[in-house]
Amino acid sequence: MDRNTELRRLAQALHKPAESLNYLDKLDAVALQKLRTQFQNSLLNKFGPVFEKIASTGKLAPDSISATLCTKVFGPAITANMSYFTPMNKAVSLCKLFDADFMAEVAREQIPERTATMLAELPVDQLKKVTAKLVEHGDYHVLGGFTDYIPEKKAFEIMEVIKDPAANLHISFYAQRKDRIAKLANMQSDEKLIELIAAAFSDEQLMVEVGLITCEMDAKAQERMAKLTDKVNKEYRSQARSKAEEMGYADRLKAYFSA
């Protein structure tokens, strides 16, 4: 688990810059994750029975009426909390009646750890529309949280609709499962990876991110990344080595640097 990723996710949940949380320096990634989930679950823990009752009441109502209540009366925050108690077939039907803007607002309020089943059941076309809307507004932290739980096949299809390579890296910036990101990256074409590499080396934070992703790849995949990096710029691997040594992950990139 990457500590910096978890710190960024906690900062987003608290609506504070990560730099302001230096009083948490003694906490490791697991402790930061626990703190974040406790904070995100606090409202649900307090009002869970209320949200469950509202969701239960809506089970018998026609989907069109339930959808109107969600968008016109409850709003995105209550709808997000109700979603954890709504039968999955009902939730999927309602989502088909929501526009992408409202779905994106609901996504911003949801707790990623509680959405795995919903992400597995929602049609990928709906997820693509929500993703496009969140990318449009720069909500990379929201997408990063969901990336840890969305089925890999769907995640790969969604990556295809994100045209800006830097956006994919910004999303990864907030994803804890770098191993899953590495697997998805390895499924991309050489052309796509070259675009990602070029975007990464234009921003120091993204260069670190692509380094952490490459750390999770096997030797063969690292060698492929090395060759593609050289195609972009033969000086880039030297820059990557300096940053990796500074950040302490150079020993995990032996195949990348020796290729």
Describe each region flagged by the PLM.
Residues 1-259:
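Hydrophobic packing positions in regular secondary-structure scaffolds
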